Every structure is written in structure tokens, then in C-alpha cells.
Amino acid sequence: MRMLVSGRRVKKWQLIIQLFATCFLASLMFFWEPIDNHIVSHMKSYSYRYLINSYDFVNDTLSLKHTSAGPRYQYLINHKEKCQAQDVLLLLFVKTAPENYDRRSGIRRTWGNENYVRSQLNANIKTLFALGTPNPLEGEELQRKLAWEDQRYNDIIQQDFVDSFYNLTLKLLMQFSWANTYCPHAKFLMTADDDIFIHMPNLIEYLQSLEQIGVQDFWIGRVHRGAPPIRDKSSKYYVSYEMYQWPAYPDYTAGAAYVISGDVAAKVYEASQTLNSSLYIDDVFMGLCANKIGIVPQDHVFFSGEGKTPYHPCIYEKMMTSHGHLEDLQDLWKNATDPKVKTISKGFFGQIYCRLMKIILLCKISYVDTYPCRAAFI
């Protein structure tokens, strides 16, 4: 009798396991296409990474038959004198849209404030907001507002292409063209989004240390390695095979914020004049230009790429950038640059406390595109 009951229980569990396996396989089949597109495509593209980064055939397919001669677009607003006869540590370009006045105002009061950097950090930076023209539907009124804004602040450069996501590479070309023409002596160049936060005291201290050793061939940020082109036509990042035929991009840094040395800026500008700029994903185009001249990006754990950093003094101590800050920009600037932040990790117990807090905040199982877990141990 016991054997009969035991046999029934075994069959019952076998049935449950079979049902579970069937449901699992059915779910896997249903979701396989998006899983395959996301995971498998990354695995495939990463396997091509060495070839893409090491050989010239990628750039050969994108090279122009005739080198571009000068800018294709004219300046509507410009400040040729911005860098003249000055020792510039950092030329900072902020990618912005014509309508984003509030974002520009917040940056002027915080990390983009030249006077603050000069008086408090003993460094000379030049901040410029890079943009195109307003959408035609928004008319001349917004352009008049931009002209008024620039008369007040003298920190906008604008060319006569329409400002849109699909013209981001044109905006990048404008930045490198301006730097090459009007500020070739800047020690470093940085490009950043207008919803980014930059811990300027930490960044300036870092760049000054690099300047002292005469660093060259320098490009740093959050590095994307072996990233595949998006072939999904519903994505705004869609890239056709006609535009880019290879299974992986060269290594590049996230466009949210990255820094290059002045010599790299000059080389990238020259390379940009020889490549087809129809690829509108600007950070990828930057990677193609750098790949052409043999510059390899370096990953910095405190450049957050597209992610927003956790709010905590132990994080602020070494942070460089954090993405996605609008309403909280002023408060974050005040808290992160408070001199007391530098004292929180002093002493044995302070170091232990901050190490534990960073492990708790950064070493999570769920994927968050912010600082990696290894940043907790630096």
C-alpha cells in the first residue's frame, strides 16, 4: 500500500516537473527573439571586437573619396575670441537644444561656471553651449531668445543645421572644428550632455595632475566595448547595413560625458574630415574617428555613462560625472562640493564606513548603468 502511494507521489511530481518544463520552454520560445537580439547580438559583436579595433577595413568603407574642406555649415552665433591669448586647461562643450534654457541656466550656476573654477579651483576653463537652429515649427521667436541669451552670457555657439537627434554628429563636428580653429592650445577638451552633473573640483584636480606629467593620446569616460549596431527599425538608434555593415562598433565612450587631451582633439578633427558623417550616433562616430588614428579609450569607474549615481557623501568624494540631473542639479552641486565631503572617509573608521557604504550602494545584482562594483574598492 505504501509503495502504491509512493508511486503516485512520484508520478505527481513528474507531472509537475513536466508542466513546469513545458511552460518554461514555451516562455523561452515566445521571448527568444528579444533575448536573442539583445544578448546573443552582444556576444556575437564582442567576438569581432579585436578585428574591428585592430584593422583599417572598417574605416576604409566609411572613408570619403575627397577630404572635406572646412565646415559645411555657417555660424549664426560665435565667439572667436573666447580662448585668445589664454592658458586654457579645459575647453568644455555642452550639447544642448535651443529650447533648453533652464538647463543652461542651471549649468551656468554650477559646474559650468568659469568664475567659480577660476577663483575656487585656480584653473581656467571655457564653457560653450553647442547647438543648431530651432525646429522650423518653432519659428523665429526661439532664435531671437537665443540671441538675447547669448548677448547676456556670451557662451553659445550655433551653426545653421537643424538641431535634432539625427544631427548629433553635425554638432560633434562643430565642436571639433571650433576647437581646432579657435582654441587649439587647450590642454583638454570635454563634451557633455546638458542633463549631466560634473563634479568640477574632482575633475579639475584630476586634469591638473595629468597636465603635470604631459599626458598625450588621452581619452577617458565610460567605455562601451564590442557594442553591436542596433538593427531594430523601431529604435531611434537603428543603423542600417548600408550605413554601417559591420557586426560591432570600435570601442567608444558614452556620449554623456568624456574627456580627451588637446593632441587627440586635433587628430580627431583631421580624421573627421575624411569619414562619412551620415552616421548620426555621435559617440559612435567619435569612436570611428579615434579608431582611425589609433586612439584607444580608457574606462574611468567614476564616469557614470548613462546612469545616475547614488546620492551619498562617500560617493561624492571621488565622483566625476553622473547622468540624468535636472531638478536636483542645484542640491546635488551644493551637497557634492561641500568641503565636509572630503573629511568623511578620513581615519581608519571613516575608510571602513565609506568602503561598506559603497559596496552596499554599488555592488547590486540588478544591472544599473552607473559606477561599477569595482569602484567601491578604489
Swiss-Prot record:
The gene is B3GNT5. This is Lactosylceramide 1,3-N-acetyl-beta-D-glucosaminyltransferase. Glycans are attached at residue 59. The keyword Transmembrane applies. Its EC number is 2.4.1.206. Pfam families: Galactosyl_T. Keywords: Developmental protein, Glycoprotein, Glycosyltransferase, Golgi apparatus, Lipid metabolism, Membrane, Signal-anchor, Transferase, Transmembrane, Transmembrane helix. Pathway: Protein modification; protein glycosylation. It is a single-pass type II membrane protein. GO terms for molecular function: glycosyltransferase activity; lactosylceramide 1,3-N-acetyl-beta-D-glucosaminyltransferase activity; N-acetyl-beta-D-glucosaminide beta-(1,3)-galactosyltransferase activity.
